[in-house]
Amino acid sequence: MNFCKAFSLLKILTLLVLAGILSACGGSDGFPPTVTGVKVQSAQYGKTATIYIGGKDLRTSVVVETNGSCTNPTFASSSTTDLLVLSCQARVVGDFPLVVKSAEGAVIYTSTLTVPKPQVTLITANGGFSLELNQALAPITVDNFLSYVAKGYYSNTLFHRVIPGFVAQGGGYTSGMVKKAGQLAPIVLESNNGLSNIRASVAMARTNVANSATSEFFINLVDNLSLDYKNSGSPGYAVFGSVVQGMALVDAMAQQPTGVINGFADVPLNEILISMVLQTQ
């Protein structure tokens, strides 16, 4: 064998050995992924959260687990080997685990993420006030209310029933006491949840039928313990949150003169219009 042939054979053998090493490691993706940090943007209950996972040699073949707390996970096309961008829908309130695993199932990173209690802000001509919603104790009611908020249903509805020393009720009528269309199906009554109709609490209005609440809600201007759950024969009204900012504005509603309009009593003569309701947390 001459020198040139021997050199060529050595070169081929070297390439084969290198190829074998790369193949054993998984090719260019052979280095194990590492995570150096996680950042969450827009972690609001019921909305899409964006999770940024930074590190090295990351691939969309890694597995991100949230114990069902953030559903429908999807990696963005903008993800790189140094930064994975994951979107998912936050379905719990409070702390939940985030675990990143390699494609082979090895845990490479763990963390705890937090979704705060949802808050919404109601805007009227006289200013705004904020509600904090208790998803843990009234999950069906909170999801229902946020569904109306998300589709903009409450825009241009009225606080149509205001009784000093009792309640301010809204969310079902437009100017001139016209019933607003587009309500969702009635929900199951969640009044036996440990929450009470105390001052500044917010509850769902309903008919005499227990499971009849749709869009209308009321704010308790005083402690109305008579509206609490007593038993199945006296189920009360489901509290699902409270006013956490701007209660003075709600109290001012009760100072407005009221009368009978289109057969409805206790209607503010100067309309109290809700221009919009936004989820702010």
Regions found by a protein language model. Give the residues of each.
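Sec-dependent bacterial lipoprotein signal peptides
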Residues: 1-23
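Cyclophilin-like peptidyl-prolyl cis-trans isomerases
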Residues: 25-281
